[in-house]
Amino acid sequence: MQNIDLIAIGKMNATYFAQGVAEYQKRLGGFCNFRIIELPEVQIADKNASDRQIAKALQKEGEAILASVRRGAYLVALCVEGKQVSSEDLAAMIADRAMSGAGDMAFVVGSSHGLDDSVKRAAQARISLGRITLPHQLARLVLTEQLYRACTINAGMKYHK
């Protein structure tokens, strides 16, 4: 069974988002070994942080992210400059990896400051959930639902209309 990880910076604090993610995580269990890895957000003491302070925090988060990726996994970074993909595109990406025999995948959601360039460079794909700005907890919920939707598309189920 294919391993799919969601690596995210920060905790799910909002109960309603966490419940939604938990529901789709449970549903995904029938299609893949789905795992969520939550890494701590590097705290910046100064509310008016400089670009340098933010870059340093992103670098530390990036190191933690890259250390958490399974060896040989296909890394997908969610970022603003990523390619906008449809549910069918995501399903094809997952199916292609599963068929290749090296099916492990890791999807990464960064902190409110985004992702370090080292993660973007290491990623084999960069995708975007769209041009709108989403809170990171909501982005995790949307991504988890889309992963479930992609798996149902690949299984020929009627969930996707």
Each predicted region: which residue ranges?
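Conserved RecA-like P-loop NTPase ATPase core
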Residues: 6, 76, 110, 143
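Conserved beta-strand scaffold positions in the cores of enzyme catalytic domains, especially
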Residues: 36, 75-77, 126
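General small-molecule cofactor/ligand-binding pocket signal
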Residues: 7, 35-37
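Short glycine-rich anion-binding loops that position phosphate/pyrophosphate groups of nucleotides
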Residues: 12, 80-83, 111-114
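N-terminal beta1-alpha1 ligand-phosphate binding loop
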Residues: 1-28
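Short, well-ordered alpha-helix to beta-strand connector turns
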Residues: 32, 72-73, 123
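Structured adenosyl-cofactor binding patch, chiefly the S-adenosyl-L-methionine
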Residues: 113, 117-161
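S-adenosyl-L-methionine/SAH cofactor-binding core of RNA-modifying enzymes
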Residues: 40-105
